[in-house]
Amino acid sequence: MKIYMVGGAVRDKLLGLPVTDHDWVVVGATPEALTAQGFLPVGKDFPVFLHPQTREEYALARTERNSARGYRGFEVYAAPEVTLEQDLARRDLTINSIAAPAHPDSAKGLFEPDFDALVDPYGGQRDLQAKVLRHVTDAFREDPVRILRLARFAARFADFSIAPETLAMMWEMVTDGEVDGLVPERVWQELARGLMEDKPSRMFDALRACGALQHLLPEVERLWGVAQSAQYHPEIDTGIHLMMVLDMAAQLGAPLPVRFACLCHDLGKGTTPADVLPRHIGHEERSAKLLKDVCQRLRVPSECREIADVVAREHGNIHRSGEFSPAAVVRLLERCDAFRKPRRFADILLACECDARGRLGFEQTPYPQRPRLLQLLAAAQSVATDKVAAEAMAAGQSGPKIGEWIHQARVEAVRQSAAAAPAP
């Protein structure tokens, strides 16, 4: 029995990056041999075991073959005769197909990888040095999820290029309809992970380069080539703007719901009639409608969906909020449900800041709307609603009239706060 550290742990070690997750493969062993050493079997679809102390996963060496279209089934074969080279061959990219032999530390009951004796049959170290994302074998085409995974790695390793032969294979897979059969949950999973990388725009560059974005997110694909007013958008192209917004969200460390909102905030611009360009009147409502379609199709979690909907509808109003009257500000806060969900409102404002700064030449420009609206929200929240309601009832008011009294009290609080700190 031989044990190797494999995959991302080896790759990241060679790149000098922090190694968080350790993956191990066991060659020449049976399930019985591992359980006899205290390993706990947990694999449902193939033999995977947890180390009795570290709880890290150890998988028996295996081969895989696709048995259905669109990542709906794989035939797995795991046996002692499966070699390390065969196991590495099933992996997606050469940079993920490097193994480090592990030697047991008998005193600790652990395994220590030897990075001076790497096993690299498919040139992963060469591609790491050349900064190339390359498929290992033609088995890449058997799993269309690998297109999404490669695009995600393009976002993580932004200075890597895609090998021409790999891009050609991805094109063939898309042309053959392989991505059309992908399970929606898996598409969302990879999309979400890619959005959280350091350069999410590179994921969409990769998906566009192979034609996959048109199949997975046509609402996003159609934004390229759509003109915007150069006065407000010097980058002009809506697709370019969208990518700048996403990268700004990554730069500001935004959470996933904010990044998804950034992705979808301008979808409606893709349906603006050509004869009215570069104006996009009413694109906010069109964006919200298209967003609903995307969320239903990909089964997007409610937290992401709800923030994206508010951002799509209200980002223009938030940008212009410095011109609003106190009453208009309170109405905006009410539409954003800011009184019930102030933390979500803060995320909505962050998405709007990413939108404003995701423009050519505006990357370093302050966004005063964000701190100002948070200040005005705090002022409106300071209203003692119970006291106002009691006063309204004492004056003979009931039902919606009580809400109107509370609304007016909040307007007055915003008026006073705005007077103390006027909009810049």
Swiss-Prot record:
ATP binds at residues 8, 11, 91, 149, 152. It holds the Pfam family HD. CTP binds at residues 8, 11, 91, 149, 152. Magnesium is required for nucleotidyltransferase activity. It catalyses: a tRNA precursor + 2 CTP + ATP = a tRNA with a 3' CCA end + 3 diphosphate; a tRNA with a 3' CCA end + 2 CTP + ATP = a tRNA with a 3' CCACCA end + 3 diphosphate. The keyword rRNA processing does not apply. One of its GO terms (biological process) is RNA repair. Its EC number is 2.7.7.72, 3.1.3.-, 3.1.4.-. Mg(2+) binds at residues 21, 23. Residues 238-339 form the HD domain. Its cofactor is Mg(2+); Ni(2+). CDD domains: HDc (cd00077), NT_ClassII-CCAase (cd05398). Keywords: ATP-binding, Hydrolase, Magnesium, Metal-binding, Multifunctional enzyme, Nickel, Nucleotide-binding, Nucleotidyltransferase, RNA repair, RNA-binding, Transferase, tRNA processing. PROSITE patterns: HD. GO terms for molecular function: ATP binding; CCA tRNA nucleotidyltransferase activity; cyclic-nucleotide phosphodiesterase activity; magnesium ion binding; phosphatase activity; tRNA binding. Catalyzes the addition and repair of the essential 3'-terminal CCA sequence in tRNAs without using a nucleic acid template. Adds these three nucleotides in the order of C, C, and A to the tRNA nucleotide-73, using CTP and ATP as substrates and producing inorganic pyrophosphate. tRNA 3'-terminal CCA addition is required both for tRNA processing and repair. Also involved in tRNA surveillance by mediating tandem CCA addition to generate a CCACCA at the 3' terminus of unstable tRNAs. While stable tRNAs receive only 3'-terminal CCA, unstable tRNAs are marked with CCACCA and rapidly degraded. PANTHER family: MULTIFUNCTIONAL CCA PROTEIN (PTHR47545:SF1). Comprises two domains: an N-terminal domain containing the nucleotidyltransferase activity and a C-terminal HD domain associated with both phosphodiesterase and phosphatase activities. Monomer. Can also form homodimers and oligomers. Belongs to the tRNA nucleotidyltransferase/poly(A) polymerase family. Bacterial CCA-adding enzyme type 1 subfamily. A single active site specifically recognizes both ATP and CTP and is responsible for their addition. This is Multifunctional CCA protein. It comes from Polaromonas naphthalenivorans (strain CJ2).
